[in-house]
Curated annotation (Swiss-Prot):
Annotated signal peptide: none
Name assigned to this protein: Lysylphosphatidylglycerol biosynthesis bifunctional protein LysX
Cofactor binding mode and count: Binds 3 Mg(2+) ions per subunit.
Binding of Mg(2+) 2, residues: 1093
Keyword Metal-binding: yes
Chief location category: membrane
Lysine--tRNA ligase: region residues: 666-1174
């Protein structure tokens, strides 16, 4: 019936439902393990604990998370109090009846009111355990709003009212008797009226169960009780007449002593009444146990239910480490109406405990939770959840429950796991001890274990268990060796004599994870055995395809951790002390410390409930479900006992589910729409839906909308240049369609251009123009075959004789006239921009031409192209902030290169006299008109040359690139003209041929300042000049850095025509040789055009002693916190000590060269620049 055996009745909600709640007490994952919890962060859950209270307690607000969401129960009514009032009334009588049956003193104290109540109001015999048990069940059922309890109580009141009415009508009673009968009749009438008016408050049903089996048990117990009672009466008859002894015994055993004692002449000994009632109670208790167990067994998982759950796990089970435990067979299940999510649960003492998160599609979780809450309401259960993740708790909260964090689950990431380091010292020492004892570890899937060997494994697991029963509910599977669990993992520790001393069994967590289910060890196993198994599993996880391991759950982890911290508050210390005290029985602290030593990722899990006032009842349900409190005759099913499948008919009708519980065909589930079912279907715009519908019609007609390709004979440009009547086939995208009935015109575009195609019914080999119009949309890719001709207006056209669809466009293209106007949209959907924008395609072509021209120019001069590492152990070659990444294999940080310079110089040492690299570089800096964090960089080195040699070389590279992209050595510059028709933006060509100006840095700054400076100008003077010119500087900068700042603010940004600025201060050029004749400057130049630096060149520093001194200065800056300073690269310095020839080096930003040549920003010239996240 799902009614608890408790006598107390909880408080009431205003809406009339019994208060519902859940509190998760400690629960076991295995024999010695407390329940576990998992892997989402607690972001998104609101918290009620204030910072002040948190500080006072000395614990984090997360550990006392309480949320108060909207109510999930029925609305209020005028008679919401009736079930609780009826339950409390009957419960008080049940309690007093039980106490009177036990204690003669209480029986004497309540004798007078008991007799009055028994005679006129309600059956209240002096001693009867059976009647006390019946009333207790009735009180619990009334409180749970069971409709059958309402019917029983109403029938009792009606029958009592009829009896009182008959007595009143008969008359002849004393004044006291008349008063009692009239008062009783009035009370009964009022009770009947109240019960009838409160009928709708008793909505709860009773679950199906073995009613006839329970009745048979009661009947057998009753017969045995009557016979035994009759025998006792015969032995101790007292004053009871012989012919009344059997009836007296039957009245006390099965009649609940309801018959008037005056009907019997005489009495047996008083102690016999209690024994007779006890016999009746035993019969009822036995029947109730059979009924309750049958309710659970009959409504537990069926094979079809488990098969459906496994299908959902295969489709959606990658996120929840507890998902596989939903296949535990002593649970029941409720599905969302779509079948795409479900919740497994068990009912204990009137509490419906959901096991963790819903299983299935996250989008269908609210449906599943709603179905579960409706089920709880239907049967009058209090809803509760154990072990929900943050995402699951948020879903339950949105459905009206409250979330409380219980603790954290330990998650190991094998990619980050290592035994080295001081924090792993304890584990490392334990593993060493186990290995010295000769232990080895064997890891296998259950499917790879022979039946006889698995039988031995089960025997060992049972013999090593230190409790009488298996523990666990939400975080334990409850079975071992089942064929359906073939993917489970078994880890065994084996001694030198090939004897198994310990084992771990782990269930699948998606396809790449495992979750601990069972942990056993022999009493003879040495210390460190468990640590050895866990470490070996983590270290060899990659070979098993495992990327995450869920270990045990640490209940109240935050309390242990924060209560032990320095400065913890008194309440936090007291709370930790209580947990340590209770750890003597429930191993709370032991589990926390046993998990903590592996340095896991701690992930919170939550309990959810509806109202805090019944937390004790839900706590009792939790410990019963987890096995810490074992009820008599309880059992845990390892086979299917359910007879009533919960799978939605829509899913069951597919025939994909298996009666043995094995997983269904996942591809079949996808085909029947389980991945896109009712209620949460993919929402698409109307135009997209129309195109999807058209695609389905094409497929149903046998047309492949995405066929295998075949090369066309001509591009569009080639077709337009072909002779009249030439046979051609072209492929492209439909940009426009004009339908004139029997004749249809379309614009077809490929990379080379756009042309008109003409479909005339009279010239098509098969079909008609209408077929083309019906099958295609703008944006579709088609292949056209025919001959070249012209339309009536003389427009060159392809006269189509045949066509086929080669790619269905399922989304509409942007506006055919305006294209994509939003710059961000053009960046994010570059593929669309290229499809509709001819200028974007021209930029891609221009960029390709620039890259090709640069390579060809260098190849013509005998340069060798190489590739150097992008992932580097040190960041060097330039002063810039690097990107940092991490390599798991060696457990160390790496940097994305900011420049390939140091590796290319190693090649120069090796004798590669002319070398270049054209590749990607990365700098963790700003994003603007001319900067992108990822860019293309050219670095070239020529032996026996200097920086002046590269002035001509660089100019030649850029001019050749401009020639290749624009057809002439010109650069395109944006211009804005204002006229009568408004402002017009356009690009204007600028000639960049010939020789470009060369100026020294100090001369250019002097001209800008109007005051002469040189390399000998003092720092104080330079600072005064900065102040006068409004140029900012830092006090720690030297003179060279101040000069560079003046150059960037006054010279670089004002430069228009390409200009080489040479001879920079030595201090800002750490990899450049000093000038051969000028003190204080280095042989370096920067090329600037229109305010943007395009490249730089050095006479490379080849003196290894001076190079070491400069890099040591840079490393000191890096150690002092400068993120852009270069680190000391000993490998590079050692290579330099083998002597590098005099070399000139060039570095040039290809993206900026493309900007110069095309007149566009860096974001426009890159196919896919970095875009801000949505």
């Amino acid at each position: 019936m799902g009614v608890g055996l408790h006598l107390t009745v909880p408080g009431l909600r205003r809406d009339g439902r019994g208060v519902q709640s859940n509190s998760h007490d400690t629960s076991s994952k295995t024999t010695a393990d407390i329940s576990r919890c998992p892997q989402h962060t607690d972001a998104g859950l609101q918290r009620a604990a204030t910072p002040g209270i948190s500080r006072l307690l000395g614990i984090s607000s997360r550990s006392v998370t309480l949320t108060k969401p909207r109510s999930a129960t029925r609305g209020n009514s005028r008679y919401h109090w009736v079930p609780a009032a009826a339950g409390w009334t009957v419960g008080v009588i049940a309690t007093l009846s039980l106490l009177a049956s036990v204690s003669p003193l209480i029986r004497w104290i309540i004798k007078v009111p008991r007799e009055f109540i028994n005679d006129y109001l309600f059956n209240f015999p002096d001693t009867n355990f059976a009647w006390s048990f019946v009333l207790a069940l009735l009180a619990a059922a009334l409180t749970a709003r069971k409709r059958i309890a309402w019917l029983v109580l109403l029938a009792n009141m009606v029958l009592a009212a009829v009896v009182n009415a008959a007595e009143i009508a008969a008359g002849g009673n004393t004044a006291a008797e008349s008063f009692g009968e009239n008062l009783g009749f009035a009370v009964h009438v009022v009770a009947i009226v109240v019960l009838v008016l409160g009928y709708r408050e008793f909505w709860a049903k009773v679950r199906r169960g073995a009613l006839f089996r329970a009745a048979a048990v009661w009947l057998a117990g009753a017969v045995v009780g009557i016979v035994a009672s009759w025998g006792l009466v015969e032995l101790f008859p007292g004053s009871l007449a012989p012919d009344e002894r059997l009836g007296y015994a039957a009245n006390r055993v099965v009649g609940f002593a309801l018959a008037d004692p005056d009907l019997f002449t005489g009495r047996p000994h008083v102690f016999l009444n209690a024994i007779f009632g006890l016999f009746g109670a035993f019969a009822l208790i036995g029947a109730a146990i059979v009924l309750f167990l049958s309710q659970r067994a009959d409504n537990a998982l069926t094979g079809e239910d488990e098969s459906a759950i496994r299908g959902l796990l295969d489709l959606y089970g990658k996120d929840d480490s507890l998902g596989y435990f939903a296949t535990r067979r002593d649970k029941s299940v409720v599905f969302a109406s779509s079948g795409r999510a479900c919740i497994t649960y068990r009912v204990e003492v009137g509490v419906c405990l959901a096991s963790g998160d819903p299983v299935g599609d996250h989008r269908a979780w609210p449906q599943a939770v709603d179905a579960w809450l409706r089920l709880c309401q239907t049967y009058g259960w209090a809803p509760g959840v154990m072990g929900a993740s943050s995402q699951g708790a948020q879903t339950y909260r949105e459905a009206g429950l409250t979330a409380l964090e219980l603790g954290d689950e330990a998650i190991l990431r094998p990619a980050d796991f290592k035994l080295s380091g001081p924090e792993m010292r304890g584990v490392r020492q334990a593993v060493t001890r186990a290995r010295r004892a000769g232990l080895t570890v064997r890891i296998r899937r259950h499917r790879d274990i022979a039946e006889d060997e698995m039988a031995q494994t089960i025997t060992r697991a049972d013999s090593w268990r230190d409790t009488e029963t298996e523990r666990g509910f939400s975080m334990a599977l409850g079975r071992l060796g089942d064929p359906a669990d073939s993917d489970c993992l078994l880890v065994e520790a084996i001694d030198p004599h090939n004897q198994v001393l310990a084992m771990l069994s782990l269930v699948p967590w998606g396809t790449t994870g495992v979750s601990l289910d069972l942990m056993r060890r022999s009493p003879q196993s040495p210390n460190g055995t468990i640590e050895l198994m866990v470490s070996e599993l983590a270290l060899h996880a990659e070979s098993l395809g495992i990327t995450r391991i869920s270990l045990n759950f640490a209940v109240f982890r935050a309390a242990f951790e924060q209560g032990a911290q320095l400065g913890a508050g008194p309440v936090a210390r007291l709370w930790r002390g209580l947990l340590v005290f209770f750890s003597r029985w429930w191993q709370l602290e032991t589990l926390y410390r046993s998990n903590m030593k592996y340095q896991p990722e701690w992930v919170p899990r939550y309990a959810c409930y509806e109202d805090a006032r019944v937390i004790p009842r839900v706590g009792v349900a939790s410990v019963i479900a987890e096995g810490f409190l074992v009820l008599p005759f309880s059992r845990r099913n390892r086979v299917h006992t359910g007879h009533h499948p919960a799978v939605p008919e829509r899913l069951a009708a597919t025939g994909l589910l298996h009666h043995d519980g094995s997983a269904p065909d996942v591809s079949g589930l996808r085909q029947v729409g389980l991945t896109n079912g009712d209620g949460v279907e993919r929402r698409l715009p109307e135009q997209v839906r129309v195109r999807f519908d058209k695609l389905e019609k094409l497929r149903s007609s046998g047309i492949d909308a995405f066929p295998v390709g075949r090369p066309p004979s001509h591009t569009v440009a080639q077709a337009l240049a072909a002779d009249h009547q030439a046979s051609v086939s072209v492929s492209g995208r439909i940009m426009r369609i004009r339908n004139y009935g029997g004749v249809l015109f379309a614009q077809l575009r490929d990379w080379s251009g756009e042309m008109q195609v003409l479909l005339d019914n009279s010239r098509l080999d098969q079909g008609c123009a209408a077929d083309f119009n019906a099958a295609t949309d703008l944006g579709d890719l088609v292949e056209m075959t025919g001959h070249m001709g012209a339309s009536k207006t003389g427009t060159p056209s392809l006269i189509v004789s045949g066509w086929r669809l080669i790619g269905k466009c399922l989304r509409p293209l942007p506006n055919k006239w305006k294209g994509l106007l939003d710059p961000e949209a053009r960046v994010r959907t570059r593929y669309l921009d290229l499809a509709v924008n001819a200028e974007s395609r021209a930029l891609i072509t221009a960029r390709s031409s620039v890259l090709r021209a640069v390579r060809e120019t260098l190849f013509a001069k005998g340069f060798v192209e190489v590739e150097t590492p992008i992932l580097q152990q040190l960041h060097g070659g330039a002063t810039a902030r690097p990107f940092v990444t991490h390599i798991n294999t060696y457990s160390m940080d790496l940097f994305l290169r900011i420049a390939p310079e140091l590796y290319l110089k190693r090649l120069c040492v090796g004798g590669v006299e002319r070398v270049f690299e054209l590749g990607r570089a990365f700098r963790n800096e700003g994003v603007d008109f001319s900067h992108n964090p990822e860019f293309t960089l050219l670095e070239a080195y020529q032996a026996h040359a200097d920086y002046l040699e590269w002035i001509d070389g660089c100019r030649e590279l850029i001019q050749n690139a401009a020639q290749a992209a624009n057809g002439a050595p010109i650069a395109m510059r944006p211009r804005t003209d204002k006229g009568s028709d408004g402002t017009r933006h356009h690009l204007e060509p600028v000639d960049i041929s010939g020789i470009w100006p060369v100026r020294t840095v100090h001369d250019a700054i002097s001209e800008a300042l109007g005051e002469r400076i040189d390399a000998d100008t003092g720092l104080t003077t330079l600072r005064k000049l900065c102040d006068a010119a409004g140029v900012p500087y830092r006090t720690q900068w030297d003179a060279g850095a101040v000069v560079l700042e003046l150059y960037e603010h006054l010279v670089e940004c004002r430069t228009e025509q390409p200009t080489f600025y040479i001879d920079f201060p030595t201090s800002v050029s750490p990899l450049t040789r000093p000038h051969r004749s000028k003190r204080g400057v280095a042989e370096r130049w920067d090329l600037v055009a229109w305010g943007i630096e395009l490249g730089t060149a050095y006479s490379e520093l080849t003196d290894p002693v001076e190079q070491r001194r400069r890099l040591q200065e840079q490393s000191l800056l890096a150690a002092g916190g400068d993120p852009e300073a270069m680190e000391l690269d000993e490998d590079f310095l050692q290579a330099m000590e083998y002597a590098m020839p005099p070399t000139g080096g060039l570095g040039m930003g290809i993206d900026r060269v493309v900007m110069l040549i095309t007149g566009r920003s860096i974001r426009e010239t890159l196919p896919f620049p970095l875009a801000k996240p949505h």
